[in-house]
Structure formats: C-alpha cells, structure tokens
Amino acid sequence: YSMPWRDNFCETRTSNRTSPLCSLNKVHQGQDLRTGTATECLQMRAQSPRERGLHEAVATEDGIIQYIGSYSLQLKGTETGFIYSYVHLNMRRLQVSVMDTVKAGDVIGVVSNDFGGTPTTYHLHFEIKAPVEGEGIVHVPPYTSLVSAYERREGGIGRVVEDETVEVASAPVIVDPSWLID
C-alpha cells in the first residue's frame, strides 16, 4: 500500500454520516489505504475490470463473512464481535462467499476501484464497528490498529513522516486505547 499513511477517520465528507467519536457531522467513517503508484494505477486502468487488483485484502481476524454487497463485504470477528468492512474490492475476484469462515490473514479478495458501477480511485476503504460504552455499536478509528499490525508484520516501529507538505483534512481524534485491536 502507498505510503505515507494518514488518519482520515472523521474527515468532513458530503455524505450525511455521523459518529459519536467525531465532533462533526458528515464524516468519513473509515480509513482509506491507497494502493500502488500512479504508474501501477494507470496500468490497472488498461486492464479489464475482472483483472484489476494489485494488492490482496486479508481477513483482520478469525470470523465469518456476513455480507457481500455491490462493492464491499463485511467480516464479523468471532473473538471480538467487531464488524470489519472492506470497501472498493474487485467483486469479480472475491475469494469468499457469505457465511464462509475465515482465519486471520486469509485472502478475501483484491483491492480495486469498484464503487457500485461507478469507478473510484484505487484504494481500500477499511472500517471497524465495535461496541462503545453508552453508544452501542459504532464506527471506531481503524488507523492506529492498522499501523500496529504493520509494525508487527515488519518487526519494528514505523517511520513518522514529519513533512509539512502532507496535509490533514481534519484534526485527528484522540481515542481510548481500549478501542485498539492488537
């Protein structure tokens, strides 16, 4: 996935989505992870929709595929009960079906630009819904959990980008450490 990453949970968007963890309405409820370089994305655009996809999307934890839509799927974790949404997958190349049981790390599909018949940029939009005391099941910030998983895989701490040219669309949300998935 393309680096640097930045947290874009709670960014202002046009859709009327809310989260009790965001101070604004009309917010982004997940984390966008860009895939590939500009050259790789141009090469994918030349491919048929069935072929498109550069990076695999994998199961976050052991669980059951509970929903497959026109451009997304949902995995419910068996240990945590968290619901993970994987959006903009190549729906023609899914490796799973509804009610399939998966293990953490199993390939479920490939990231593409599907958006219900309208293409978007090549990226994975990743969401986590989890229980938050007093709020019920709500969208929670996935960014720190993704960074933690990356650092575990790489066997070390990631590099913080201090470049002032990387803009942040909205202020990051300070989250309760109990919401993080290790």
Question: Each predicted region: which residue ranges?
Answer:
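Surface-exposed, glycine-biased beta-strand/turn segments
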Residues: Y1-S72, K103-A104, N113, E151-D182
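Zn2+-dependent peptidoglycan hydrolase active-site motif and core
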Residues: H28, R45-V98, G117-E127
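Conserved, short, structured surface segments that act as functional micro-motifs
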Residues: K76, F82, D100-I181
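Intrinsically disordered, low-complexity acidic/polar segments
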Residues: L42, Q95, E135-I137
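Flexible, active-site-adjacent loop/turn segments at secondary-structure boundaries
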Residues: M3, D7, V87, T144
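Short loop/turn segments at secondary-structure transitions that flank enzyme active sites
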Residues: T39, R92, A130-G134
